[in-house]
Design a protein with these regions (language model features):
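Short acidic (Asp/Glu) patches
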Residues: 74, 84, 88-90, 96-103, ...
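Short amphipathic alpha-helix that is part of the acyltransferase structural core
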Residues: 317-370, 374-389
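Acyl-donor binding region in acyl/amide transferases
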Residues: 345, 355-358, 391-551, 556-566, ...
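Non-catalytic C-terminal accessory region of glycerolipid acyltransferases
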Residues: 2, 9-15, 113, 148-296, ...
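Conserved N-terminal entry element of GNAT/NAT acetyltransferase domains
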Residues: 290-331
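Secondary-structure boundary elements
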Residues: 109-113, 156-163, 196-201, 350, ...
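Conserved nucleotide-cofactor-binding alpha/beta core module
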Residues: 113-147, 151, 158
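Membrane-anchoring hydrophobic helices of lipid-metabolizing enzymes
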Residues: 1-93, 100-102, 109-113, 129-130, ...
Length: 588
């Protein structure tokens, strides 16, 4: 065996020893053939020759060319890796050496000042030693010393403002009985410590695929058998294509909510894992065409304006420039109400909801007050809410008079403990105004004014929707967070959903069973936005209610509204932060 070989098993024995001579003359060749070591040495020889012939091309690209392995970035883009400042790219580790070659190729295409913190075996090749910072995953006193040096070097590299990448699991993905799947082991907390200490932007990545069944079967017998198979696994990936997903960068200022490095590194792992659940689907029509009616045409502006003119002065709750917020009952605004039903349907269909009818109006619209935002310059209904005085509605119609009774069944004394409350719902802002935060703020200024006008009321409740357009895993993540952190269990016993949500039973949630890694709704939103094809996070309205110190009373599925997941939420204005409340009330 030539000394230039990448791997020479005879070197396991002392040079010139009898054992080495016997091994080399008897079993070395068949063992190296069985483990594909001979094939790897031939591959490495070709790579080395190409590096010498064309030094302008980096080692990683030469290696992938010789192996005939192509990678395809199916989500995100390599260009999302920041070009300056300390960056830490973290990825799962499904294959072994191939992962390092692909990661190196991607990084070198974006930043020349990039290195990989990885198994020392990946850095054995002299052509690439300057691109690796080595650690030893095999344990022992010597490994501990080497790893301390590797972590120090990694810290210095990040401190210099350079780019570092790693596989935080330390070892290749394997079968995990507790998850009943092939998956990375828990990621090492040192990765979070380094990222936090050096304020590095973290970029999650996910490499799609897994090693052979034989690899995982032998690994269940003994982990070292898995290690022995790694060369064979590298060689059997020749002539293949690997899909890569690159997530959104996580800036260092988002680390603060994680009190421990264990929590933070679990969050990094989740951000990588969630990428594997993305779906490559084109946008579809939210409702089957045979069930959808054409939306009614808008009425003449003068007809709508006449409804506004007919309102009493007290109907105006607040205004700002061309925008006015009014409150009215159904019989006071017959034409505006039709426009509300029209624009509701437009808005909800755009996010996979909606009734499928020409107008989104129902019998509850006749029992509720309507708070709507009017643009007097363009004669547009920009958005609206409807509010019902619960005690008055129940006294006349029972709990069946509440829209939420279509989703939940209430006990007879359900509302006794809440006192005087208002049910709000069917909230929307038309698409062209949704990026303007002032629309929702103005509506809420009007809502608060209306509540204050009605003495004794301070509590608002209603269903906030998470549309069926969301990925089932997104809904499961949101639901689990709310149940753990925001559920008021006492009231939940007094209501029963007609159809209970089942998203928490999603098998994929097992990979995200680290509740401490999601200390805030913003962390959940980060996962959700990676998963959703349109990059939407947790619904804005849900975040808005929770910002107002809202609590969840229960969960249900609205079967009459495109099977939207509804969280039944309660906001007590007397419990809202006074500074925040003044902001909504329009006070300085």
């Amino acid at each position: 065996m030539a000394d230039s070989a990448l791997i020479n098993l005879s070197k396991l024995f002392p040079e010139a020893s009898l054992k080495r001579k016997i091994f080399a003359n008897t079993v070395q060749s068949p063992i190296e053939s069985c483990l594909s070591i001979k094939q790897l040495n031939n591959i490495y020889s070709e790579i080395s020759s190409r590096c010498k012939a064309n030094p302008e091309k980096n080692f990683f690209d030469h290696s992938l060319n010789v192996l005939n392995i192509n990678y395809k970035i199916t989500s995100g883009a390599a260009s999302s890796i920041p070009k300056t400042g300390p960056v830490f790219v973290v990825s799962n580790h499904p294959f072994g050496a191939i992962d390092g070659l692909i990661l190196g190729s991607i990084l070198q295409s974006q930043r020349e000042d990039s290195k990989i913190l990885a198994n020392f075996l990946l850095g054995m090749m002299p052509e690439v030693q300057d691109k690796f910072i080595s650690v030893n995953p095999f344990g022992g006193e010597k490994a501990t010393r080497a790893n301390l040096k590797g972590l120090r070097d990694a810290g210095q590299w990040l401190k210099s403002g350079a780019c570092l990448a790693t596989f935080p699991a330390g070892i290749v993905a394997h079968y995990r009985p507790e998850m009943k799947s092939i998956h990375d082991g828990p990621w090492h907390t040192n990765i979070a410590r380094l990222a936090r200490k050096h304020s590095a932007t973290v970029v999650p990545m996910h490499i799609e695929g897994k090693n052979s069944s034989l690899f995982h079967l032998l690994g269940r017998v003994h982990p070292r058998l898995r290690t022995a198979m790694l060369v064979r696994e590298l060689c059997n990936k020749c002539n293949s294509e690997v899909n890569i997903r690159i997530g959104s960068p996580i800036p260092a200022n988002q680390f603060k909510g994680h009190e421990t490095n264990e929590s933070l590194v679990r969050y990094f792992q989740m951000r990588s894992d969630i990428l594997s659940h993305q779906e490559n689907t084109e946008e579809e029509t939210p409702l089957p065409t045979e069930q959808v009616e054409d939306i009614t045409e808008k009425q003449d502006d003068s007809i709508l304006a006449q409804d506004i003119e007919n309102l009493p002065p007290s109907a105006l709750l607040c205004e700002k420039k061309a925008f006015q917020v009014y409150v009215a009952t159904a019989d006071e605004i017959p034409h505006i109400l039709q426009e509300i039903g029209r624009t509701r349907e437009i808005t909800f269909r755009a996010v996979g909801e909606g009734t499928g009818k020409a107008l989104d109006l129902d019998q509850y619209d006749q029992l509720y007050h309507h708070i709507f935002l009017w643009n007097s310059e363009t004669s547009e209904v920009v958005g609206a809410y409807r509010l019902g005085l619960v005690d008055e509605i129940i006294s006349k119609h029972g709990t069946k008079g509440l829209y939420s009774s279509t989703i939940f069944q209430y006990s007879d004394d359900a509302f006794d403990s809440l006192g005087k409350t208002m049910e709000l719902g069917r909230s929307y802002v038309i698409p062209k105004y949704q990026r303007r935060g002032t629309s929702l703020s103005l509506l809420w200024r009007g809502i608060i004014k209306f509540v204050r006008r009605n003495e004794g009321y301070s509590k608002l409740f209603g269903a906030v929707s998470i549309s069926d357009d969301y990925h089932p895993l997104s809904k499961g993540l949101i639901l689990r967070f709310l149940r753990k952190n925001k559920l008021q269990a006492g009231f939940a016993k007094k209501m029963k959903a007609h159809k209970k949500p089942t998203f928490e039973k999603n098998r994929s949630l097992k990979a995200f069973n680290y509740p401490d890694a999601l200390p805030s709704l913003e962390n959940v939103s980060g996962l959700v936005s990676e998963l959703e094809s349109d990059k939407k996070g947790v619904p804005t309205l849900l975040k808005h209610y929770l910002q107002l110190n809202g609590v969840i009373l229960g969960f249900g599925v609205d079967t009459s509204f495109s099977d939207a997941l509804d969280g039944f939420i309660l906001v007590d204005l007397d419990e809202v932060n006074p500074t925040l409340l003044k902001k909504y009330e329009g006070e300085d």
